[in-house]
Amino acid sequence: QHFFKVYVPGVGTPFMQVGDSGVGKDALLGNATARYGERRILWALAQALNCVYRYLTRSGKGPGLFSAEEVMRFCEDFSLGKEELLEASNGAAEKRQRDNKNRRTLEVMLNKLHDSIRPHMIDPETGQCSKVDPGRVQRIFVSAFGFSRGAAEARVFVNWFLAMCQIDAELRGQTGPT
């Protein structure tokens, strides 16, 4: 109940939660271009937030805060595709617009978590939580593993996770990752 494991299948393999059949064109493009890699990383970020939610609400392996359908909507809102990369090379304004959209997607995810666990969060005025059972989360340890392309995906996940933690800190009016 204090440890959570999440497995994300590698690109080019079946992963229906993100719309990857792992066969035919999906397998070919997954192996050649890491198709749906971004979706896998966003799914993993949602699962990290689901783990916090499950711990604090004692829902164990039950349904998390984010459904598969909701994660797919986040994937549609988040964009690092070819068009965005080409736009980014044309100027900083387009890159900022894309980055802001991606940041808003992460903010939506974090705000939903905040709303669902508010009694467990520290009140900035009192410095206390109104609900301390099952306990106060002071640290979260994350291990990300992968081999070859999976290692690259694991590194990107860790970088996005740290960015999400920084956004979380900013949303909470703090200076560092929370």
What are these regions (language model features)?
Residues 1-178:
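Active-site- or binding-pocket-proximal scaffold segments within functional domains
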